[in-house]
């Protein structure tokens, strides 16, 4: 644990230039507390806790600060943050002095709410009251700085604390490394890991796991395995979390065979895979369409007595839908329902998407109604999937009804919602309505993306409104959106259809200069149009260029 040398508290206090006077009214927010602060039982309800605290305040003499701190801690643990702070203020107003544990709760509150100035003020109060901060205090400050993204300040705090005689323990370093990894500063976390032995601390699995996790999430799997090998060399035993993370990384990188081998390794060294291990592997296999292999893993899971959960079945359903075996997905869905396995919103979203993909929109709508009957609240993904399916089926009125329903139920719309509707409207030639919807979209604060602009430009070109399409294309560039190859292909095709070959060729020549390489579709569009107009020489020239670029097989 933390050890402290003689005069360091006073020096550290002034080294950070803490404020000596922050009004209690400024400390109005609380935090999710750590288990180390709250080992006592929680009050049964908020009202009971407040009543108990109020009765204790009115006692003469009042109970020990320990009793008050227990209630504050239990409130914080139950996420009743403002209430806990309000009661703390009442405690102070009655002149009842907090102890170190009470102040640790206050610091954790400020850190959890990212109010670091107030956290440091509470930290200063520890010194003013003659206490010495413990490992919980300093760990909490470090965690708070990391939560706020203040990596440099966190590392500076760590260095300064060491310089003034404080020694951190394994828990503190685990917290610091985890905090750095959570905000994407994996390199800084690795640096801390490398320096830990200099301070007499032996690295452990809790320090390695967050770094391995961060590396796997950005598919730096080889780097993650380097750390895994380092753990083994240092006789630091990996745990189920280590293996789960590595299996996830391998699946994310498409290295499914290696992921299965690692699962076998786990079992051989008597580390029991949990439901998360199997779910990760099943999901990875299903996403690659390897349903047979996924079912084999499911069989192993059953043999080893690990019960599949809703996530397991959702992955299987999604896998079947990806390979257009929607009936098999529905069989899994029905089996879940019959076995009283809790179907969630994601389960319905998967099936609704599967039916919409194969144009069975009415079946999707039936599931949507079933969700309501079961008091499951559809989310934005549910609505977007149905709106897209209806729009592709040219049932725009129904799709627009769902848009209205989203607004009425307070369900957020996004750019995907509007892109589906715009595409559907252009497909049935409701051009003016589409442009009105585009205006409504922007007025509601939703920024269009490149797909939105491609839908608009394509729809206008196909409706014979090339001039309007060109205006939007130019507006796209003026607003800093980078047209992609699809955007250029749409406009070039529009020019060719109107016989504007010079404009089409000019735009083709400008593409590369604008950072967008033409593809086979670009050349084929122009070449086909030139041949149709007997511009054979120019068409053959472009054909040779296409071959030279390796775009013709």
What is the predicted function of each stretch?
Residues 128, 185, 198, 233, ...:
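Short, conserved catalytic or interaction motifs in soluble domains
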Residues 33, 49, 64-69, 84, ...:
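Pentatricopeptide repeat
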Residues 1-171, 180-191, 195-198, 202-206, ...:
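N-terminal targeting peptides
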Residues 511-553:
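C-terminal interaction modules of eukaryotic adaptor/scaffold proteins
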